[in-house]
């Protein structure tokens, strides 16, 4: 041994140039921050001296693992966290998620509270995928997929959001910005899916007829979301993504493993900025309605927002905007009934915070509560066979009985 640093600094010449499956220079040198004056430096000096070029295209450095207080881990302090203990308690994917969620550009903290938070984040990912898979139980992609032009506006909007998320995640992976990948996907699952899209879809998924075009429309999009989530999450939580992939509905040409599939491919038609702008404004109105519903619930004017009738008092311009959607506003707002008025006043209306020409009135919807969809509709009791169901649910149940 001439010198350990000189020997390690020569490895790129000894290994990369002499192995048929490798090439010089290396794509990346990856090591701790202490190697700037060590292996990175010695490799660079040897390469410049012998080949007049750097031996690597990229250098990526990371900090060291410390405890939750930022102290170095020592057995004497009793703060060492063994990977096998983490895997035994939480599973390998939570440990992988901790690595990806951490800012490796500085020292990385690890401890019981941090792992608990990451476990919570992991289960949010898992529950999101589980909801998607559970609602694809009767979906056969080659038989039930709805063409893009026949999807509802809401479903098209979610494909646009999926395209945006795919772009951001792809860029973050290419820049080795794994915390950004984690944050982007966590926000997508928690905000876009769980708190909005999946919540809105429950009526369509559970109450419409199995082959209703609106139900197949959202199943088509859920299928695309599930495939994309498996692909984008695979580098982080590989075991969970693979497990989910195996439970996806089969289709012709489905790769045996998510590891063998192509990276997410987004058709150009999914990208629709004009549609997205309209829906983002509608979502802001939805936030205003949720605030009014919460106030009505606190005042016990309604016990459950699903039983409410919402009246939107506004001007002609906003009324025209709201009438331009080919989706039921009651579905998006998750209430029984919605009315848009331009020429009435309501003393119980709550002024919107963001929209100066909008006030929102909330009251108990007229009619009776449907035993199946839980909405209050005036058609409940009108069907002689199913007197406790609304007209929509009675028709669906009758078709189920006769099929």
Which residues does each predicted region cover?
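Structured secondary-structure scaffolds
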Residues: 1-139, 158-202, 220-233, 369-372
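Acidic, turn-prone loop/beta-hairpin segments
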Residues: 139-167, 198-292, 296-320, 339-342, ...
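Short linker/helix segments within small regulatory modules
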Residues: 379-388
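Flanking scaffold residues of small Cys/His-coordinated metal-binding clusters
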Residues: 365-368, 385
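Short metal-binding segments enriched for Cys and/or His
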Residues: 91, 396-403
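A glycine-rich helix N-cap at a beta->alpha junction
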Residues: 327-340
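Cys/His-rich metal-chelating microdomains
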Residues: 376-379, 393-396
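Short cysteine-rich clusters marking metal-coordination/redox-active sites
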Residues: 370, 390-393
